[in-house]
Regions:
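Glycine-rich FAD pyrophosphate-binding loop
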Residues: 33-54
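Short coil/turn connectors at secondary-structure junctions
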Residues: 12-13, 34-37, 55, 166, ...
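Acidic, glycine-rich active-site loops and adjacent beta-strand->loop/helix elements
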Residues: 21, 44-46, 57, 176-178
């Protein structure tokens, strides 16, 4: 049984991100860009998680308030407004963020009108953003393990190249076994296993 507490650590990082798909990559980039020393750990031998096999697109708002009303309707009151407001505050910044990330490798961004899935007010105020081309990148060659047929590999390539450019440490083939806590129960680390 792995202990929940330890006397010392093998390595020290400000932030350890577990999982190297889209979410893990963006979390690692955000922590690094905020000044943290980051370790990005992935249990599989190759990065990408299931994200690399996804469509790789992001549905974004043309109109923040209309999209807020749409999301509020789709959640039918189950998500507090302050959570949806915080979500929208970040959602309206994603297009610019992806544009910035895409400069790392000259990725081409494609925007397509794509309304919401349900005919609630505001459903027609959204669009779809994807990476649809990267010079000298062939997803079937470069990510043969992913067997992806859609845009996921393109978005992941942009994220992976940004991770590499920033020199963020990554570990593949290591799994998180247990969180390590201090004597007050606060998380102080993570037990990673490469076996």
């Amino acid at each position: 049984m792995l202990s929940r507490t330890v006397d010392s650590f093998d390595e020290m990082f400000d932030v350890v991100v577990v999982g190297y798909g889209f979410g893990g990559a963006v979390s690692a980039l955000s922590a690094h860009d905020a000044g943290a020393e980051v370790l990005l750990a992935e249990k599989m031998p190759n990065p990408g998680g299931i994200s690399i096999c996804s469509g790789g697109g992001l549905r974004l708002p043309h109109d923040r308030d209309a999209t807020f009303q749409y999301l509020k309707a789709t959640n039918d009151g189950t998500t507090p407004d302050n959570i949806l407001e915080a979500f929208m505050d970040e959602m309206v910044q994603i297009d610019e963020y992806v544009q910035e990330l895409a400069t790392v490798n000259g990725a081409r961004i494609k925007r397509t009108e794509r309304p919401g899935s349900y005919a609630f007010p505001g459903f027609d105020q959204m669009y779809f953003l994807q990476i649809d081309d990267i010079p000298d990148f062939d997803p079937k060659r470069d990510y043969a393990y992913a067997n992806a047929l859609s845009g996921g590999p393109f978005m992941f390539k942009v994220l992976q190249d940004n991770i590499a450019k920033r020199g963020i440490k990554t570990r593949l083939g290591v799994s998180a076994k247990r969180l390590i806590t201090d004597d007050k129960g606060a998380v102080a680390g993570v037990w990673l296993d490469d076996g």
